[in-house]
Amino acid sequence: TQLQSSAASDVYKRQEEIWENLPGERAASVFLSEWYELPASDASDAMGDTFWSCCLAVRQDVNKAMEAERAQGNIRGSLDANVVLYATSELRQMLETLGDELRFVLITSGAELADLADAPAEALVGHVEGLKVLVSASDAEKCDRCWHRRDDIGSFEEHPTLCGRCVTNVSGEGEVRHYA
């Protein structure tokens, strides 16, 4: 359709526009660039296939819990949500390696880990053994740039509608992420 054709053209233009404004040397076009060679990973690596398969399974359980909240009208989208994962110590230790980036893997505004024994009755049991999920609507303001709901919005005079992460990305050195 005409709409699809127009949207595809816009995506192409935006990719090139972003590419032109990235710092550093690079190929003339995003479509002429090469991908980085990543080191091989296997299931025995600390953050190998087994780790990421488990993270995806946890995310599926979180998505299921968010759908229930969405159906009840408590949240509109995943970035409106904060999530508490009540997990066994083994699962909790594994997920703790992601640090603050757990919320990016889950695509939520907030993510906390807690002991499985502390799970309230309303926490949902999913497919991942040793995990219960509690989703709640975030009370924080929504960042105009990334749409995450963060408590620090309004704390930056030069960017009053942005979260700290976005201020760092817009005016500072840029955030450092390791996993997600």
Regions flagged by a language model, labelled:
Residues 6-65, 69-96, 112-134, 161-162, ...:
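Acidic, turn-prone loop/beta-hairpin segments
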Residues 143, 163-166:
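Short cysteine-rich clusters marking metal-coordination/redox-active sites
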Residues 3:
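Cationic, low-complexity basic patches in intrinsically disordered or flexible, solvent-exposed regions
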Residues 101-114:
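A glycine-rich helix N-cap at a beta->alpha junction
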Residues 146:
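Basic, alpha-helical nucleic-acid-binding regions used in initiation and control of genome expression
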Residues 153-161:
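Short linker/helix segments within small regulatory modules
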Residues 149-152, 169:
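Cys/His-rich metal-chelating microdomains
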Residues 139-142, 159:
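Short metal-coordination and nucleic-acid-contact micro-motifs, chiefly zinc-binding Cys/His arrays
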